[in-house]
Design a protein with these regions (language model features):
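C-terminal catalytic region of ATP-dependent kinase domains
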Residues: 53-186
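Alpha-helix capping and helix-coil boundary motifs
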Residues: 1, 14, 162-166
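Conserved kinase catalytic-core segment
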Residues: 8-74
Length: 186
């Protein structure tokens, strides 16, 4: 679990491992935000460690999904803002230049845009189910769509009536603005 990792392993990481983990934390933060996956405190995710030939790879995986598409406060969907993740956030700001952080955010958005385009039918069905279910209170929906409208300037957020509409607007925004940002795009 992330909280155990922060307590036991984080203080002993080499600079190279800190950079690798910081890169993954930036990407995890963006994945949570784009998917409206909230409350990713350190005990709600795991750090998966994979030994490669000459280095260690890190992947952060969510294990608790009960706050997905529920909260109105946009910061709840960004693990970097949660106090339990302060050490990860601090480490990231120290070991990664701002330009690198911005690049990793763009890469994650481009990857999500390509995945969304590739799974259009399945995603459409999921969003339809989300729109038919009341996932959150209307005041939380209004708060979140207002915050995302202010952040992006995209009027599709203003038109959203529920969390399914908000997620659809977010995915549409990502696909329109980041689909071709991937260095691996064909």
């Amino acid at each position: 679990p992330g909280d155990v990792f922060i307590e036991e392993r984080l203080p002993t990481l080499s600079l190279q491992d800190q950079r690798a983990l910081a890169k993954e934390f930036v990407k995890f933060n963006e994945r949570c935000f784009l998917r409206l996956l909230g409350d990713m405190r350190s005990y709600n995710y795991v750090v998966v460690i994979t030994q490669d030939f000459d280095r260690i790879q890190y992947r952060i995986r969510a294990i608790d999904f009960d706050q997905q598409s529920y909260e109105g406060n946009a910061k709840v969907y960004q693990p970097e803002h949660l106090p339990e993740n302060a050490q990860f956030a601090e480490m990231t700001s120290v070991v990664l230049p701002k330009a690198s952080i911005e690049q990793y955010v763009k890469e994650e958005r481009a990857l999500l845009a390509r995945r969304a385009a590739g799974e259009h039918l399945r995603l459409k069905q999921l969003l339809m189910c989300m729109r038919e279910d009341e996932l959150s209170a209307s005041d939380k929906v209004d708060e979140l769509k207002g915050a995302l409208l202010a952040l992006t300037g995209d009027v599709n957020f203003k038109r959203a009536g529920n969390m399914g509409d908000i997620l659809e607007a977010a995915l549409d925004f990502i696909q329109r603005n980041f689909k071709t940002d991937s260095p691996f795009a064909s």
